[in-house]
Amino acid sequence: AEGCADLTGAGVYYGATTSVASECDDDEVYVIGGANSAGQAAMYLSRTAKSVTLVIRRTLEDSMSHYLIQQIRARDNINEMPNTVVHAVKGDGHLEGICLEHTDTGEREEFSCGRMFIFIGAEPRTEWLDGVVVRDDHGFIVAGPDLRDISGWTLERPPHHLETSVPGCS
């Protein structure tokens, strides 16, 4: 979105590290994304932030685990904005505001915002592993229990939790 590159590290973050999260005391923060990483970040940030708004392009049910949706909806200080995307951010040296666009109506709204955490667009960079470990159709490495139904697993024992198709390689 417009303005994000200029404010990266100054209110716009691509992760919720402990050091940044500890600075969110009593802040109203925005988490962008609708998959598990965004939901887990929202839960984590809700411990200290005044409020957390999850901005979701579609709905949580489209890409988040059911258990996590239940946890989010049980937390009083987490709000959902489905069918919404970030149009732009603004600030002079630090994030000050966010402009959100509702995808179903095209309506735009501006909000004061000092911190925005982005968890979208996971894109694997695993081409170099072609022929070495099993990857799914999207390029993500298949590991642990997910290997059981894939011909790449050759041992009699089941794969360990994060083990790839190369036994012993996690």
Model-flagged regions — what are they?
Residues 1, 24, 40-42, 64, ...:
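Short glycine-/acidic-enriched loop or helix-start segments at secondary-structure transitions
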Residues 1-27, 106, 117, 137, ...:
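FAD-binding core/adjacent interface of flavoenzyme oxidoreductases
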Residues 7-9, 30-31, 57-59:
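Short, flexible loop segments at the rims of nucleotide/cofactor-binding pockets, characterized by
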Residues 17-20, 35-37, 58-60:
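Short acidic/polar capping segments at secondary-structure boundaries
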Residues 25-49:
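Rossmann-like NAD(P)H-binding beta-loop-alpha module
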Residues 46-156:
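A Rossmann-like FAD-binding core segment of flavoenzymes
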Residues 115, 168-170:
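Conserved catalytic-site loops of classical short-chain dehydrogenases/reductases
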